[in-house]
Amino acid sequence: MTSLTLYLIIFSIILYLFVNRNKRKNLKIPGPNGIPIFGNLLSLSGEMHLTLQEWYKTYGSVFSIRMGNIDTVVLTEYPTIRKAFVDNSLAFASRYQLKSRVVLTGAKDLAIQNGEIHSLLKKVVLSEMTTTKIKRMEIHIIKETEKILKILDKHAERGEPFIINNYLNMFSMNVILRFLLGIDYPYENVDETVGYVKSIKSFFAVAGLPILSDFIPIPLKKSGVFFDSYKELEIETDKLIEKFKKSRNEKIENGTYNEEEDESILSKLLKEYEHGNITWECVSHTCIDIISAGTDTSANTLVMALIELINNQEIQSKAFSSIRSSCLNDSNDDDDDDEIVITHSKYRSLLPYISMIIKETFRKHPIALLGLPHVTTEDVEIDGYKIEAGTYIIQNIFSSHRSDKIFQSPNEFIPERFFESSQNQGLIHFGLGVRDCVGKSLAECEIFTLIATLLNRYQFINPNNSKKLNDIGTFGLAQVCPDTNIILKKRI
């Protein structure tokens, strides 16, 4: 880059900021002071959720920050977020489409699309994620559970420490692939999927961090982990889609295709594409959204739940006792107590303590620490503050779940807090309003089934009794869990 080019860029930035200096929004909303050009951006590198937590403690449930030249409001606590995303849902429903994400996907994916196309994509996905459909497809979750048990049994027989993360990633990925494409990967080939899972993790680790060119007028660098990891996801996902299309077309040609029996989400997306209702990019990028989000969020929740159960053995023992006393009397007489798969549809109502453990994991370790960004489409008042149209909105989920105004002893893992149904309303781990998580019912089903079944079958042990397992993840679009080394002991 020549000196003249550099000077022109700097001059352009200064001129742009000078012209826009009097266009600041939300000046009456409290918040930390920023610095020229960058605003508060430089304070938000690294563990961004922890910085926002400190500012929440200082400025309250509604505070403003400046991300470059973009006016931003951060909302914390369930009552405040509900007022915005439920009571004023139309004003807060739209996604803020950052430049980097638009370049990455063309804004063609389910996650950041707005308007009629988003409504259509959501309708297609939700049509295969209803409670009735999930119950009918629960056999796939049962089969995945049985397959992972065979692998974990071998580790239990060896009695040696091993890292469990990849197996849980494989489980979650296979469940979502079953719903999306009607396929899965064998667990014996876990190493073959590590690259795919690694790309998901790499992308999610950086996708939540601010990219300077999204917030200040400088050229976007179309390289680095953000773009490279997504490109890898795109390549691998397109291979799966093409394989699915080939199989589907062959069945159509030879007359063996039964549309009514094809319950995969991709078949419904392809149908909309073939009718000209969506573009091919919508199909491809929405599949990436579903696979990556469905894999990483559920798997990381499972890892965090097991970490807490290992660090709190009394909770693990209580959970095991509740399973043995509450639901196994309901099983067939010829079933061994440690052999059954404890399904969500049959046993959830019989095992309230398992549900409490899962809710407490959602609370203490929300995987989407800040959700996805929204933008206000009209002026709206929240908690006495006027938030202007065009404001970038952050749902401060992590701080909401760790607020002592909402939860007593918020840094402790206490499943019993959910004995009181009122505490359920403090949870916003799946988001709130019309843009909440489309896969929440499936996630709850698979997480309950695996956690309950694993607790019934194994005791989970820390290889190092002198030190608790690390329960602190790192910031990303989805929280990245630490690699977790454990020992399994088969229950007798």
Curated annotation (Swiss-Prot):
Q: Which cofactor does the UniProt annotation name?
A: heme
Q: What positions does the entry give for heme binding?
A: 437
List the Pfam families.
p450
The protein's predominant localisation is membrane
Q: Where in the cell is it found?
A: Membrane
Report keywords, A-Z: Heme, Iron, Membrane, Metal-binding, Monooxygenase, Oxidoreductase, Transmembrane, Transmembrane helix
- Specify whether Iron is a keyword of the entry: yes
Q: Which Gene3D superfamilies match?
A: Cytochrome P450
**GO molecular function per UniProt:** heme binding; iron ion binding; monooxygenase activity; oxidoreductase activity, acting on paired donors, with incorporation or reduction of molecular oxygen
Give membrane topology per the record: Single-pass membrane protein
The transmembrane segments are 1-21
Q: Tell me which InterPro entries the record gives.
A: Cyt_P450, Cyt_P450_CS, Cyt_P450_E_grp-I, Cyt_P450_sf
Q: What is its EC number?
A: 1.14.-.-
Q: What class of enzyme is it?
A: oxidoreductase
One Gene Ontology cellular component term attached to this UniProt record is:
membrane
Keyword Acetylation recorded: no
Q: Which family does it belong to?
A: Belongs to the cytochrome P450 family.
Q: What is this protein called?
A: Probable cytochrome P450 513A3
What's the source species for this entry? Dictyostelium discoideum
